């Protein structure tokens, strides 16, 4: 069945619900005391996992649209990417405010030096910031071919973010490994999609 614009509208509504309902759950859990004895860590991990899930969902759109021959699915990619950035920002704020404290926000630079996994996290966030700021059609027209080159940096985030998660956890948990494996599979799938273009590009110089 070929998807219509109406289907895409419903998909976007579903994305909004999937991205906002967890935030509502988190707020309720905080107010009702549903978190553990270390709520700051719970909030940091929850927001980080949500950002990572949305990143993986964003990366899944292109291969899914290609293999299912549903090009309209690509219209959902920007919304997923923006929600990924939003949750990534919440993750950064939760660390800066709950872990360091507003009065010690100046220590963030020191923390980045002494904790390399934080450096990977902030690099990932900065890339997502650049992608969010240039996600409009106006930016795409203005930047031309440079727009696609910039937005290919999302694959750098797909490498750094799972490493950041794996490196940051202090207890052995399967979830960081699962997310890393999923990111690796999506990157491999993307590589297969790009390989024919790469081979064609090489032939031009023979």
From Swiss-Prot:
Keywords: Cell inner membrane, Cell membrane, Electron transport, Flavoprotein, FMN, Heme, Iron, Membrane, Metal-binding, Transmembrane, Transmembrane helix, Transport. It comes from Yersinia pestis. Part of the MsrPQ system that repairs oxidized periplasmic proteins containing methionine sulfoxide residues (Met-O), using respiratory chain electrons. Thus protects these proteins from oxidative-stress damage caused by reactive species of oxygen and chlorine generated by the host defense mechanisms. MsrPQ is essential for the maintenance of envelope integrity under bleach stress, rescuing a wide series of structurally unrelated periplasmic proteins from methionine oxidation. One of its GO terms (molecular function) is metal ion binding. One of its GO terms (biological process) is protein repair. Its cofactor is FMN; heme b. InterPro entries: Fe3_Rdtase_TM_dom, MsrQ-like. It is found in: Cell inner membrane. It is a multi-pass membrane protein. Heterodimer of a catalytic subunit (MsrP) and a heme-binding subunit (MsrQ). GO terms for cellular component: plasma membrane. The chain crosses the membrane at residues 13-33, 79-99, 116-136, 147-167, 169-189. Belongs to the MsrQ family. Binds 1 FMN per subunit. Binds 1 heme b (iron(II)-protoporphyrin IX) group per subunit. This is Protein-methionine-sulfoxide reductase heme-binding subunit MsrQ.
């Amino acid at each position: 069945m070929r998807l219509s614009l109406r289907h895409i509208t419903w998909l976007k509504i579903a994305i909004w619900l999937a991205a906002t309902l967890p935030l509502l759950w988190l707020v309720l859990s905080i107010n009702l005391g549903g978190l553990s004895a270390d709520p700051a860590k719970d909030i940091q991990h929850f927001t980080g996992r949500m950002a990572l899930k949305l990143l993986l969902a964003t990366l899944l759109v292109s291969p899914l649209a290609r293999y299912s021959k549903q090009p309209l699915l690509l219209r959902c990619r920007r919304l997923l990417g923006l929600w990924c950035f939003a949750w990534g920002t919440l993750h950064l704020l939760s660390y800066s405010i709950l872990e360091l404290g507003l009065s010690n926000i100046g220590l963030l630079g020191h923390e980045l030096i002494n904790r390399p996994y934080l450096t990977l996290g902030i690099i990932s966030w900065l890339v997502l910031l650049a992608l969010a700021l240039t996600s409009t059609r106006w930016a795409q027209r203005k930047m031309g071919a440079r727009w696609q080159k910039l937005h290919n940096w999302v694959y750098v985030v797909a490498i750094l973010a799972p490493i950041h998660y794996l490196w940051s956890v202090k207890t052995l948990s399967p979830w960081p490994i699962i997310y890393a494996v999923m990111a690796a599979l999506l990157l491999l799938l993307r590589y297969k999609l790009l390989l024919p273009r790469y081979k064609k590009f090489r032939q031009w110089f023979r």
